[in-house]
Amino acid sequence: MVQGDIADCINASATEVGVFGHGYTYSGHPLGCAVASKVIDIYQRDNIFEHADSVGEYLQTRLQALADHPLIGEVSGLGMIGAVELVADKASKKPFDGMKVGQFCAKAAEENGLIVRPLGGNRVAVCPPLIIENEHVDELIDKLSAALNVTLDWVRAEKLV
């Protein structure tokens, strides 16, 4: 462990101030804990969890409506997190090779003002903020649908389907 001059320096400082001050930002630091405690208070005061539960159900319903899109093999999600799996063949759910289709779709969404996350297996995930409203979910789904259509045109042009 710590010895010699380093230990002497730490001991001298701790003796002078009356405490051995230690810790890390992400391991119980008082300031980080105070912020986290206040955030929890705000979440409870503003009913953020109940709101997210309600809007999350709406998000999942709207995401499921995308299941008929020719590129989507599966829609998955829970609450305020959702994803669509992009497949080369809807009937067999044959995947695309690599991640380029998911990455293209994410770029198309971004160009339309929507940030999504491309995942492995050509999945595209959405994870909106907990304070989103139903009308924002509608906008999110409209923009994702537009990105899926642009992606479909691209995979056809590239002869990936």
Locate predicted features.
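Conserved N-terminal phosphate-binding loop of PLP-dependent enzymes in the Aspartate aminotransferase
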Residues: 1-161
